[in-house]
Amino acid sequence: MAWLETFTYICGWLILSSCLLVRAQLDSDGTITIEEQIVLVMKAKMQCELNITAQLQEGEGNCFPEWDGIICWPRGTVGKMSAVPCPPYVYDFNHKGVAFRHCTPNGTWDSIHGSNKTWANYSDCFLQPDINIGKQEFFESLYILYTVGYSISFGSLAVAILIIGYFRRLHCTRNYIHLHLFVSFMLRAMSIFVKDRVAQAHLGVEALQSLVMQGDLQNFIGGPSVDKSQYVGCKIAVVMFIYFLATNYYWILVEGLYLHNLIFVSFFSDTKYLWGFISIGWGFPAVFVVAWAVARATLADTRCWELSAGDRWIYQAPILAAIGLNFILFLNTVRVLATKIWETNAVGHDMRKQYRKLAKSTLVLVLVFGVHYIVFVCQPHSFSGLWWEIRMHCELFFNSFQGFFVSIVYCYCNGEVQAEVKKMWTRWNLSIDWKRAPPCGGQRYGSVLTTVTHSTSSQSQMGASTRLVLISGKPTKNACRQIDSHVTLPGYVWSSSEQDCQTHSPPEETKEGHRRQGDDSPVMESSRPVAFTLDTEGCKGETHPI
């Protein structure tokens, strides 16, 4: 099977390499900040100035080419309209539309009456109101989806942590790693909620339209910087969001490494490597996140750092490496499972049943290893169309509900956890039964022996008297009588008053051939008390005369 293992590793590395190359050029959420939008506009401006210089050297024209702050207009023909496609570097533009400008017979661009500003028609570049409303509803649905998902995951993970932490029998290295993973999912959810509150700075179409219509885009680009102290809080929120996001990916990797070592490493000491796993999960992400924060504060300290401009690879590359490595571990683990299935089929087992087991195990591994990450990483970003909307819903669904799925796999469906919960439930029911008074006094749990003595003295005319006598002694060798299942409980003592709760029946024959009298028979003409003793080794609740 060496060829299969080699093929698995080759496929894994090829997929990882291609996905890293694609993902490195893409944004993580399909949106850009104002700073990034300005960078794109400035690059277009520089290219336009080079083109204008080249056109001026070619010769004189009617209307000179120029940069109006958004579009680089070419030479215009006298008395005609010039049409230029809406620029693709403006995010919220209709990239299928066209902008218009008029070249007057005087050889100058038409200007707005009463102003020195050049007239241009950008109406076709702006998204239509119905389209804009549709995009807004789409993003609102995504927000509701991942908010509900992260909330459910947070609650289920919190309960799972309490369950595993409460039962001491569940305290082991494997469950310690699970707890760290649960905490990383919870911190990721909390950081996303905080980030949504304090770092909402994405560029909207209304803001861009107002800048374009007012002609203030160039002034905004070159204007004075604002007070940066107001962005300290949101910068901290963004840094913590990126850190907890990275720790979550790396704790998923730790789970994969732990499972992989259990399968492939002989005599694996999980306790020995626990601190190493903790360093990978919490320590290593802090290194590259701090490096990114220092680079951002030094080179591009603008607004909230919600999305970086060119330095995103500092934290994206390690995260993508963790996703790719986890995917390779997943492939290798599935390969081992498939090999075991084929070996089992060779000895005559049901093939369909074995493949169902393989499919079930693979599904669990998909949730544990986070295989959906590698699937979405390899998908190209189109930022439009039905497929992109479906992809965004699927990606955010799995990302937000993954914590809930992991809690089910590692806690709620875990046999050890279920056994401990059942034990606690049984003990709780027994404690409730002990506190509740029995209806007929027929069941007693304790070490006090109850005896009932009927007096036949001369004072019997005054009525029978009942008293409790503590009797000590060894049980006789009489045969054990069959009693109900409560005798098997520790500390149970059979009481003669239990006959009061039973239906009267004829006396039954004992093994010695004697007949036993029920409690409804006349009082025995004997002054000897009837003692009830508890023998832990022999019969329970045996009676004998003293």
UniProtKB/Swiss-Prot annotation:
Localization, UniProt: Cell membrane
Gene3D superfamilies in alphabetical order: GPCR, family 2, extracellular hormone receptor domain (4.10.1240.10), Rhodopsin 7-helix transmembrane proteins (1.20.1070.10)
Does the keyword Cell membrane feature in the UniProt annotation? yes
Instruction: Tell me the membrane topology, using the record's own terms.
Output: Multi-pass membrane protein
Bilayer-crossing residues are 144-167, 175-194, 236-258, 274-295, 314-334, 362-380, 392-414
Q: Which residues form the signal peptide?
A: 1-24
Q: Which SMART domains match?
A: HormR
* Keyword Cell membrane on entry: yes
Which Gene Ontology BP terms does the record give? Answer: cell surface receptor signaling pathway; positive regulation of cold-induced thermogenesis
- Where in the sequence does UniProt note compositional bias of the Basic and acidic residues kind? 506-519, 537-546
Q: Which residues are glycosylated?
A: 51, 106, 116, 121
Predominantly, its location class is membrane
Q: Hey, which stretches end up on the Extracellular side?
A: 27-143, 195-235, 296-313, 381-391
Q: Where is this region: Disordered?
A: 497-546
Any Pfam family the entry gives? HRM
Q: Which InterPro entries match?
A: GPCR_2, GPCR_2-like_7TM, GPCR_2_extracell_dom_sf, GPCR_2_extracellular_dom, GPCR_2_secretin-like, GPCR_2_secretin-like_CS
Output the Gene Ontology terms for molecular function: G protein-coupled receptor activity
UniProt superkingdom = Eukaryota
Which is a Gene Ontology cellular component entry for this protein? Answer: plasma membrane
- What role is this protein assigned? This is a specific receptor for parathyroid hormone. The activity of this receptor is mediated by G proteins which activate adenylyl cyclase. PTH2R may be responsible for PTH effects in a number of physiological systems. It may play a significant role in pancreatic function. PTH2R presence in neurons indicates that it may function as a neurotransmitter receptor.
Q: How does it assemble?
A: Binds to TIPF39/TIP39.
The UniProt entry's sequence similarity note says: Belongs to the G-protein coupled receptor 2 family.
> Would you tell me the protein name for this molecule?
Parathyroid hormone 2 receptor
